[in-house]
Amino acid sequence: MESIEQQLTELRTTLRHHEYLYHVMDAPEIPDAEYDRLMRELRELETKHPELITPDSPTQRVGAAPLAAFSQIRHEVPMLSLDNVFDEESFLAFNKRVQDRLKSNEKVTWCCELKLDGLAVSILYENGVLVSAATRGDGTTGEDITSNVRTIRAIPLKLHGENIPARLEVRGEVFLPQAGFEKINEDARRTGGKVFANPRNAAAGSLRQLDPRITAKRPLTFFCYGVGVLEGGELPDTHLGRLLQFKKWGLPVSDRVTLCESAEEVLAFYHKVEEDRPTLGFDIDGVVIKVNSLAQQEQLGFVARAPRWAVAFKFPAQEQMTFVRDVEFQVGRTGAITPVARLEPVHVAGVLVSNATLHNADEIERLGLRIGDKVVIRRAGDVIPQVVNVVLSERPEDTREVVFPTHCPVCGSDVERVEGEAVARCTGGLICGAQRKESLKHFVSRRAMDVDGMGDKIIDQLVEKEYVHTPADLFKLTAGKLTGLERMGPKSAQNVVNALEKAKETTFARFLYALGIREVGEATAAGLAAYFGTLEALEAASIEELQKVPDVGIVVASHVHNFFAEESNRNVISELLAEGVHWPEPIVINAEEIDSPFAGKTVVLTGSLSQMSRDDAKARLVELGAKVAGSVSKKTDLVIAGEAAGSKLAKAQELGIEVIDETEMLHLLGS
C-alpha cells in the first residue's frame, strides 16, 4: 500500500503534467472534470496532512509557466483562480461560510456572471490608452500578448468617457464564439491546417500566435469581469457598479451579469443559464458568483490561491473519458463514408453516449486513434458527440489500428477519395442501399418535401423490400402496398398516402433542396430558385451563370451543373413532375420598381430572431426586392444581427458594412 507521501507525490506529478499540457501546450489530455477531481483529491489529502504541503504543490499556485517564445509581464496584483462547487449543497455551504465569516447582520448580495470557457487576460490602460496585455500564466507572471490583443475588435484601444483612472488594469476572458470556431475548423479541414478540438483551444491558439496577423484573422471577442491595478482614480464600491462603469468607458461586459439578493436567487440564475446554455452562441462551463460589496470582499479576504468571496459553480461535465471498443463506417446520402467510434457507454452532460463521430480518415490520423484507446468524449448542447483527444499516457498494450475500407461496407463498390477532399465516398450511387435510404430520408424531411408521417423506419423497409428506388417511386405508393410494412395498419397507410399527395404542392426552393445536390443547403437552394425562377432556366445554366448567384462559387456551381447534366437525375425529375409535384409560377420582381429600403440590396441574416422565423424573414426580404445571401463579403450591403450573432457580425464590422438589429428590421419591413 502506498504511503501518504507517495500518494501526494504521484498526485502532484500528475497534476503538473496536465497543467503543462493545458496552460503551456494548449493541448489538454483529460477533461476539466477529471482535473478537478484530482485537485480535490490532493487538497483533501493536504488538509488532513498540512505538514506535508510543499510550496510548489499545485494547490499553492494558479497555472503553469509561460512560453519562452513570448516576453513576460509580471502581474502587479496576482491573477488568482477560483475555487469550484459542483452542486447546490456545496454552494449553500459556501454561502454559509461567507455569512459566518462576515459576522454581521449586513445583507450579502451576489453578482452572478457566466463562467466563460476561454483564456483569462489582463489589460493595462494608462490615461485611458491600452499599453499592455498579458495572459494569466502562473498567476504572478504571464506572457506579453499586447500585439495580439490589440487585434481584437471588441477590446477598445482607448477608453472614452470621464474620470478614467491614470492606471487601470482590466481583467477578463478572451473567447471564440461557436460560429467562429466552426468557420476556423472548416477552413482548416479544407486547407489541411490544424483542426481545434474545441473553442477554448482555438481561442488560446489564436491568442498565443507569434504573428499578430494570424490572430487578427480569428473572430475572437472579450468580456471583462474584474480589475487588478487601480491608480489615480476611483471606482464604484460594488462589483456590479464597477462592471457597469467599465461598460460606460467602452469595455464589453456580458449582458447576462445579474444581481441576486439571496442564495435562492443565485440557484435560480444558475439553472436558467444552464437551460439557456445551448443557445448562447459561445461556450461556458458554469457561473461565477461573487460577493457584490467591495467592503465585504476586503473583509473576507483570500486563501492561498483564491478569494473567499467568490466561487465558480460548474455545470455537469460536457467531457468524459471512456474506451473505444470498435470503429464502424456509415454511408451517407452523397456516398460519404463516416467513421463512427463505438464506445464503452458513458454519461456526458446528462446523456448516455455510446457512439461518437470521427469525421474522416484525416481526423483519425490527427487524433492518432487506435481501437481500444482511452479517449476524451465531448458533447455540447445538441451537437453529435465527438472524440476530442486520445489519452496517450493511458494507452493499453492491445490496441489495434483503424483500417479505412477500400470498398463500401454496404454495397461493396469501390471507395474513392478525390484529391483535395477529406471525405472518402462510395462510388455505388443509387445501387448502394445506404445512399438510397439516406437520399429518400432527406427528400421527405421537414425542410425538404415535408412528408408528414414518413419516418426513417418506413423508408428503411421500403428500400429493403425494393418498393422504392427513386424519390418519384414514393408518389406511386398505394395504401395497399404500405399495409405490408411492419406496424402499418390501413389507417396509418392512408395517412401516409394523403401526406404524399399534400407534399406534391411545394416551392421551387424546397424541391431543389430535396433533390440532395451536393453542397446545396436550404440557403443555396433558395438563392438558386430566386435567381433563375424556373427549373428550365436552372437546368440550362452554365457554370459561369451559376456563379452569379450570391454565395455560389466554382465548387457549388460545378456540383449543380453536374447534377443536371446527369441523365438519370433528369429522368427522376421528369417522373416527379409527371406524378404531380408542382410549385407556384415565379413572381418576377424588379427591384428597381419596388419602393423598399431593401430593394436591390444583398442582405445577410445572422443570429437568432425572436419575433419571426428566419425563413419568414428571408421570404419577406425577397418580396421587398432583396437578395438574401448566406455569408458576408464585400458585396454585402446590409447585415441583420439577431441575438448571439457571431463571426458574420464580426466580419461585417471589419468590412464597415451597415448592421441593423431585429427591431430596426421589423420597423423597415413595416415601412
From Swiss-Prot:
A Pfam family annotated for this chain is HHH_5
Q: Which residues form the BRCT domain?
A: 593-671
The identity of this protein, by name, is DNA ligase
Function of this protein?
DNA ligase that catalyzes the formation of phosphodiester linkages between 5'-phosphoryl and 3'-hydroxyl groups in double-stranded DNA using NAD as a coenzyme and as the energy source for the reaction. It is essential for DNA replication and repair of damaged DNA.
Family listed: Belongs to the NAD-dependent DNA ligase family. LigA subfamily.
Catalytic activities: NAD(+) + (deoxyribonucleotide)n-3'-hydroxyl + 5'-phospho-(deoxyribonucleotide)m = (deoxyribonucleotide)n+m + AMP + beta-nicotinamide D-nucleotide
- Taxonomic placement: Bacteria, Pseudomonadati, Pseudomonadota, Gammaproteobacteria, Enterobacterales
| EC numbers | 6.5.1.2
What Gene3D superfamilies does this protein's entry cite?
5' to 3' exonuclease, C-terminal subdomain, 6.20.10.30, BRCT domain, DNA ligase/mRNA capping enzyme, Helix hairpin bin, Nucleic acid-binding proteins
Cofactors: Mg(2+); Mn(2+)
Q: What residues sit in the active site?
A: K115
List the keywords (alphabetical): DNA damage, DNA repair, DNA replication, Ligase, Magnesium, Manganese, Metal-binding, NAD, Zinc
Q: InterPro entries, alphabetically?
A: BRCT_dom, BRCT_dom_sf, DisA/LigA_HHH, DNA_ligase, DNA_ligase_AS, DNA_ligase_CS, DNAligase_adenylation, DNAligase_N
Q: Which GO terms describe its molecular function?
A: DNA binding; DNA ligase (NAD+) activity; metal ion binding
Q: Which GO terms describe its biological process?
A: DNA repair; DNA replication
Q: Which residues bind Zn(2+)?
A: C408, C411, C426, C432
Record's PANTHER family? CHROMOSOME TRANSMISSION FIDELITY FACTOR 18, DNA LIGASE
List cellular component terms (GO).
cytosol
Q: Where does NAD(+) bind?
A: D32, A33, E34, Y35, D36, S81, L82, E113, R136, E173, K290, K314
